[in-house]
Amino acid sequence: MIRTDAKDGALVLFSGGQDSATCVAWALERYQTVETLGFDYGQRHRVELECREGVRDALKRRFPQWSHKLGDDHLIDLSVLGSISDTAMTRAIEIETASNGLPNTFVPGRNLLFMTIAAAIAYRRGLRALVGGMCETDFSGYPDCRDDTMKALQVALNLGMDTRFVLETPLMWLDKADTWRLAEQLGGAPLVELIRVETHTCYVGERSELHDWGFGCGECPACKLRKRGYDAYLRGESVTEAPA
């Protein structure tokens, strides 16, 4: 029998980065209960996990309309993923494009595993929506960020758990400039500033210098994309080309 007793709540995949923080705000605007979930999988930029608590605390302090909705946080040790992955996200190697055309920051199976674990937790917690920051427009080309992948995964999870999860991907068709705009629409300039200062995107974990667009090395693909998105957002434009 299909489980139908899930409450009006969401579990958000929350890494501590720009996209997932925007998704937390998006969920807080729509659901009565929002819980967050992070994973420690041996990522080089583990500093992003250290940003999670600061982002959550800032959301509670600066947005009283959301504070009562923000529920428990869950952090899962997924070091096994790092141990079986040979990528620039989990190894101190140069970031480059692999022979298959994907950047070597791609961690095979990562989002599939993240969403499956999220579904298991949401099932136990009685939450219906699973929210992730996957998108097809940030030029990385990760196959586990594609809309088709998420739709297929929703079907598989619902069949496998005999329930009615909804996988929400509010950033799926947004570029980085649009993501900044969404933050402004959700929480105005205060949310944009919170995300600029409190979140982390840099692949190499650099957090010693605050740029106009946030902390980072300024040279890795993630930093370049975040900067281009922020600059385009300020100009009222879109990001139309991949970072050089």
UniProtKB/Swiss-Prot annotation:
Keywords: ATP-binding, Ligase, Metal-binding, Nucleotide-binding, Queuosine biosynthesis, Zinc. Coiled coil: none annotated. Its EC number is 6.3.4.20. Signal peptide: none annotated. Pfam families: QueC. Pathway: Purine metabolism; 7-cyano-7-deazaguanine biosynthesis. Binds 1 zinc ion per subunit. Its cofactor is Zn(2+). It catalyses: 7-carboxy-7-deazaguanine + NH4(+) + ATP = 7-cyano-7-deazaguanine + ADP + phosphate + H2O + H(+). Gene3D superfamilies: HUPs. ATP binds at residues 14-24. InterPro entries: QueC (IPR018317), Rossmann-like_a/b/a_fold (IPR014729). GO terms for molecular function: ATP binding; ligase activity, forming carbon-nitrogen bonds; zinc ion binding. CDD domains: QueC-like. Catalyzes the ATP-dependent conversion of 7-carboxy-7-deazaguanine (CDG) to 7-cyano-7-deazaguanine (preQ(0)). NCBIfam families: 7-cyano-7-deazaguanine synthase QueC. This is 7-cyano-7-deazaguanine synthase. It comes from Burkholderia mallei (strain ATCC 23344).
